[in-house]
Amino acid sequence: MSDPRYPIGPAPAVQTLTHEQRQERLAHLAALPEEFEAAFAGLSDAQLDTPYREGGWTLRQLAHHVADSHLNAYVRTKLALTEDRPTVKTYEENLWAELPDTRAIAPSLDLLRGLHRRWVAVLESLTPEQWARVFVHPVSGPNTLDTMLAYYTWHGQHHTAHALNLRQERGW
């Protein structure tokens, strides 16, 4: 792996997906909670408090970050479907990772399971026109739901790979 920050490569560029590409990414999004949880299964507190790379977040912080990030993406999905080009709010992900609810990872893993069931149910129901709906991010600009699906599929796999790579590297 050449860059430990991006074990599966960089985030995808803005794109329009075909029906087949959407179905493939939806399957990945549906499977993510189980795969993500398996990457954290059986880890001790000391292991969870280990950064996945020098200067990076701990595995514990990654577990909470993915739940927080995907929760925000779910809300952005619903905003894009119910409002005309809504401007979404950013959040301070580094500060969220330090809040008192970030000790035990089980609640975040539970949240991810239920969240992904609901999120995938919404996404599976979309028409081609709805996939083109847009929300506006203050930093990245306009994002279609296609772009959002591609990004968050990558995001989940990206952080799962961080955990799996550290486990392999340390023999856990």
Swiss-Prot record:
Keywords: Cytoplasm, Hydrolase, Metal-binding, Zinc
GO MF annotations, alphabetized: hydrolase activity; zinc ion binding
GO cellular component labels: cytoplasm
One Pfam family, short name: DinB_2
Cofactor: Zn(2+)
Superkingdom per UniProt: Bacteria
Entry's cofactor comment: Binds 1 zinc ion per subunit.
EC number in record: 3.-.-.-
Subcellular location: Cytoplasm
Positions contributing to Zn(2+) binding: H65, H155, H159
Oligomer status and interactors: Homodimer.
HAMAP family from the UniProt entry: YfiT_hydrol
General function of this protein: Possible metal-dependent hydrolase.
Similarity field: Belongs to the metal hydrolase YfiT family.
Name this polypeptide is given: Putative metal-dependent hydrolase DR_0841
